[in-house]
Amino acid sequence: MDVRQSIHSEHAKTLDTQALRREFLIENIFVADEYTMFYSHIDRIIVGGIMPVSHSVEIGGEVGKQLGVSRLLDRRELGVINIGGAGAIIVDGQRHDIGHRDALYIGKGAKELVFVSNEASRPAKFYYNCAPAHTAYPTKKVSPADVAPVTLGDNLTSNRRTINKYFVPDVLETCQLSMGLTELAPGNLWNTMPCHTHERRMEVYLYFNMEEDSCVFHMMGQPQETRHIVMRNEQAVISPSWSIHSGVGTKAYTFIWGMVGENQVFDDMDHVAVQDLR
C-alpha cells in the first residue's frame, strides 16, 4: 500500500515538478494479476486498479491488517468501473458480470472480493475508489444504459464533453462516494474549464483512453497559485479540496472522477472565473 499524506496549500505552492508528482500523481494503476492500492490521508480515500490476466485476483484479509480491520470493506464502501475487456466481480459468492464501462457499487460489510477477466488477451481493468462508510447499502451494478448522460461545453471553446454520473444519489445510495466518467468529443481538449474547487469534497481523476504520443496537462493548485502535472494514459491524480482540477490534452481523452467528503451535491462547487486564474 502506497500512503500519501495530506499537504497544506502553502506548502504545495513551494514544490518543484518532481515533488508535485511525488505528492499527487499515481503512475502505475494497473499491474497484471495484481491489485494496486494508494491510500490518501485526504478524506481517507483509497484508489487503485485490478487487472486479472492469467488468474483471478482476490482482495483478502491481508489488506485488512493494514487498515486495522479484518477485511477491506469492514468499515468501507467500494466503487469499481471497468475500462478494459469484459470480466466479473464475485462478491460473497455472487457473480456480477462487468463489461466495458460497466460499474459495480459494493457496500460496507462485503467479505469475499474476487476479480476475473473473461479473456486473458483482453483483460478487464477494474479501476476503483474506496471510502469510509457508516452504514451498508446494497451491492448494485450500474451500466452506461442506466446513466442519463449530460453533454456540456462547445466545440468553439474546445470543451465539449459528455458526463456520465454512475454513483450519484439519483442512481443509487452510497455513504459518501460519488463516481462518474467524462468523455471529451473528438477534437476537444479541455475538461472542467472554467474550473472550480469544492471545499467540502476532495477528488481523484483517472485519465485514460489516451494514445501513446499524447498527454494531458492537469491543472492544480489554488486559483491564484496554479501548477500543472503532465499525465499519461491510465494515470491518476489526487486533488485536495483547496485545489482546482482541470486539464488540457494534446488530443481528446476520457477520465473517471471520484469524490468523497461531507456531501454528495454534484453542483456544490466554488466556481473560478478564467480571468481570476494566475
From Swiss-Prot:
Disulfide cross-links: none
Enzyme Commission designation: 5.3.1.17
Record SUPFAM superfamilies: RmlC-like cupins
Binding site for Zn(2+): 196, 198, 203, 245
Classification via Gene3D superfamilies: Jelly Rolls (2.60.120.10), pectin degrading enzyme 5-keto 4- deoxyuronate isomerase, domain 1 (2.60.120.520)
An annotated Gene Ontology molecular function: zinc ion binding
Keywords: Isomerase, Metal-binding, Zinc
Record flagged with keyword Nucleotidyltransferase: no
One Pfam family named in its UniProt record: KduI
GO BP term (any one): pectin catabolic process
Cofactor section: Zn(2+)
InterPro entries: KduI (IPR007045), KduI/IolB_isomerase (IPR021120), KduI_N (IPR027449), RmlC-like_jellyroll (IPR014710), RmlC_Cupin_sf (IPR011051)
UniProt similarity note: Belongs to the KduI family.
Protein name as it appears in the record: 4-deoxy-L-threo-5-hexosulose-uronate ketol-isomerase
Taxonomic lineage of the native organism: Bacteria, Pseudomonadati, Pseudomonadota, Gammaproteobacteria, Enterobacterales
